[in-house]
Amino acid sequence: MSRIGKRPISIPGGVDVNIEGNVVTVKGPKGTLTKEMHSLINIAVEEQQIVVTRPDDQPLSRSLHGLTRTLVANMVEGVTKGFSKSLDMVGVGYRAAKQGNKLVLSVGKSHPVELIPFEGIEVEVPAQNKIIVKGMDKELVGDFAAEIRKERPPEPYKGKGIKYENEVVRRKAGKTGAKKGGKK
């Protein structure tokens, strides 16, 4: 039995869970999330808990069991608390600004990069070099944060670029000076 999959998910107050076939709909204070799960896994609501079960011990069923439970748990957490991901910009002249609903990045390119957040995603810029991506869908929050990071990933020599707040950038030593004259 999957250690993660067999744990029931408790439904907090103010959250409504509706399961039709393999489509799970979760309504809460922050909004509504709907996701279609794999038809092999059974999802049921039993006395203020969501229980995820699998029909057999086939490798596919076993791998989907924990995944489905985690996806449903993330939906419940998303409509109650929401998710956020912070990014830091390291480098001279690297800055972010919000113009309307667009995020404008100055990351050393010949032009400012404009990114439009996905639907249901909110972007905050508390400082010029800090970006916070918020939303109730964990997958979309992570995808948009990755989209921002992709514009200028951190480089290993000076660490310049856009990195996640808790990301550790592996640093490399630079070139050592060559002797005068060199090889002949």
UniProtKB/Swiss-Prot annotation:
InterPro entries xrefs: Ribosomal_uL6-like, Ribosomal_uL6-like_a/b-dom_sf, Ribosomal_uL6_a/b-dom, Ribosomal_uL6_bac-type, Ribosomal_uL6_CS
Annotated GO biological process: cytoplasmic translation
One Gene Ontology MF term: structural constituent of ribosome
GO cellular component term of the entry, any: cytosolic large ribosomal subunit
Alphabetical UniProt keywords: Ribonucleoprotein, Ribosomal protein, RNA-binding, rRNA-binding
This protein's record includes keyword Cell cycle: no
Sequence intervals crossing the membrane: none
Keyword Transport annotated: no
Assembly and binders: Part of the 50S ribosomal subunit.
PANTHER family membership: 60S/50S RIBOSOMAL PROTEIN L6/L9, LARGE RIBOSOMAL SUBUNIT PROTEIN UL6M
Annotated function: This protein binds to the 23S rRNA, and is important in its secondary structure. It is located near the subunit interface in the base of the L7/L12 stalk, and near the tRNA binding site of the peptidyltransferase center.
NCBIfam families per UniProt: L6_bact (TIGR03654)
Family matches, as HAMAP family: Ribosomal_uL6_B
Family: Belongs to the universal ribosomal protein uL6 family.
Protein name: Large ribosomal subunit protein uL6
Organism: Desulfitobacterium hafniense (strain Y51)
Gene name, Swiss-Prot/TrEMBL: rplF
